[in-house]
């Protein structure tokens, strides 16, 4: 939905009051994309620029558009995060430590209180996977617009429940597939639409990573203990847990539950929840979801006829139940199309996102390159005449300088190469998450439908 992606902010648009649920890694990133950063992060970015003038993250953040919003409420079940969220929400001038701050948002202990607060117009959800759909539906039923991080849900039935609630309530809903804002993906959609690759029968996507952080072995935060973490709320509704456990045992999937009882307090499970099916959707819900959405955006594939997966826990022997190696094959017989997905968390070798056509192949990331097939029918004469080379790309699209100067960690580099950190609009570099949040807010103001939700509400789901 290109119209939604490029909605220009209205100068007289109303201020939208935001409530945030979850201030962990992604919650902090979403707040920065919305214009509110931790003062300590500002300090860190300033210092990074002093040490390396090519590191322009601070300048880019300060130049980020004001989205005309106010953070009025925050919720996190870890006290350290909750208090940090309050401070961040008051950082209306983007100040470092010791700066001048604005009114502090109210901290709520439960999401139920936040979504029913009268001074909240819209809710951003950045909690663990197993809470996404529950909080999203509660917010929508309370009449709040919703920005929900991917994945949409923890289970398949919940997906349909969320969709129905969105339809019934009519709230503006945005799912956190910020790749929709990536210029190269939109250019790739045009190229496919113009038939430049010929018939495309095979697509290959890959999400390899090779670092502890990339494998979800996140830091245990100082100050975390049973007194500062609401473990009971993290685990969730006992009836829902029982339903999950009954499903797993009845289908002989006990090996995916893990050796520890879910009621047992665990800092590893709290901070590294992505490693356990009890809370996570694994590689498919964390990484494949971005790749699949990109392919769907580019080729409008919808739901496949079949999907087959295999893999296991082959490298990280740390008690996790979620595989660190996964491969999945998707089939669309009616489209004469197959997509192959592969991932390992123990190798950073990248095989790209490649669309293989009869006449040419296209690789898409934060740049786009098309290489002709040496046996192409469409370009046979041009190949024979030496006009189109077969050993190098004959078309490369670079929307902006292909630089990773301000990318400092393996995980950031991973997302940057996929166009999930930044893109370019009219030559200006933007954080894709910032653009995605901006699109959502402008859809609220202008009565439009966000780019991702238009797919979710379609008959293809």
Predicted regions and their residues:
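Non-transmembrane alpha-helical segments in soluble domains
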Residues: 27, 31, 35, 86, ...
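Solvent-exposed loop/turn segments at secondary-structure junctions
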Residues: 23-27, 77-81, 129-131, 153-155, ...
């Amino acid at each position: 939905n290109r119209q939604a992606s490029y909605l220009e902010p209205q100068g007289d648009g109303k201020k939208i009051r935001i409530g945030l649920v979850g201030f962990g890694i992604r919650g902090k990133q979403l707040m920065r994309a919305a214009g509110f950063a931790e003062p300590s992060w500002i300090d860190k970015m300033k210092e990074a620029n002093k040490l390396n003038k090519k590191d322009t993250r601070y300048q880019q953040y300060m130049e980020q558009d004001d989205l005309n919003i106010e953070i009025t409420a925050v919720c996190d079940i870890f006290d350290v995060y909750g208090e940090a969220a309050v401070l961040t929400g008051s950082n209306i001038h983007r100040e470092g430590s010791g700066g001048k701050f604005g009114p502090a948002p109210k901290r709520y202990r439960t999401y139920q209180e936040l979504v029913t607060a009268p001074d909240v117009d819209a809710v951003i959800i950045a909690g663990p996977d197993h809470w996404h759909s529950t909080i999203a539906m509660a917010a929508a039923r309370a009449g709040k617009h919703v920005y929900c991080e991917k994945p949409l849900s923890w289970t398949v039935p919940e997906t349909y429940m969320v969709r129905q609630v969105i339809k019934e309530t009519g709230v503006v809903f945005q799912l956190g597939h910020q790749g929709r804002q990536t210029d190269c993906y939109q250019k790739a959609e045009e190229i496919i639409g113009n038939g430049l690759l010929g018939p495309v029968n095979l697509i290959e996507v890959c999400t390899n990573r090779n670092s502890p952080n990339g494998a979800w072995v996140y830091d245990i935060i100082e100050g975390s203990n049973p007194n500062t973490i609401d473990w009971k709320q993290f685990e969730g509704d006992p009836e829902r847990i029982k339903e999950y456990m009954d499903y797993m045992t009845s289908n002989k999937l006990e090996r995916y539950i893990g050796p520890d009882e879910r009621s047992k307090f665990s800092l590893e499970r709290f901070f590294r929840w992505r490693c356990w099916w009890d809370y996570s959707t694994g590689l498919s819900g964390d990484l494949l979801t971005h790749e699949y959405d990109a392919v769907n955006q580019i080729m409008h594939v919808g739901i496949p006829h079949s999907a087959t997966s295999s893999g296991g826990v082959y490298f990280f022997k740390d008690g996790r139940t979620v595989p660190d190696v996964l491969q999945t094959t998707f089939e669309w017989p009616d489209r004469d199309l197959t997509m192959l997905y592969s991932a390992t968390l123990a190798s950073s070798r990248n095989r790209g996102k490649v669309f293989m056509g009869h006449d040419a192949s296209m690789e898409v990331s934060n740049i786009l390159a098309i290489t002709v097939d040496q046996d192409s029918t469409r370009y046979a004469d041009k190949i024979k005449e030496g006009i189109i080379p077969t050993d190098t790309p004959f078309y490369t699209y670079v929307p902006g300088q292909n630089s990773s100067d301000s990318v400092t960690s393996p995980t950031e580099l991973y997302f940057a190469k996929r166009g999930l950190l930044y893109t370019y609009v009219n030559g200006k570099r933007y954080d894709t998450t910032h653009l995605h949040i901006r699109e959502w807010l402008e859809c609220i103001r202008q009565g439009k439908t966000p780019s991702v939700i238009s797919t979710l509400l379609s008959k293809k789901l």
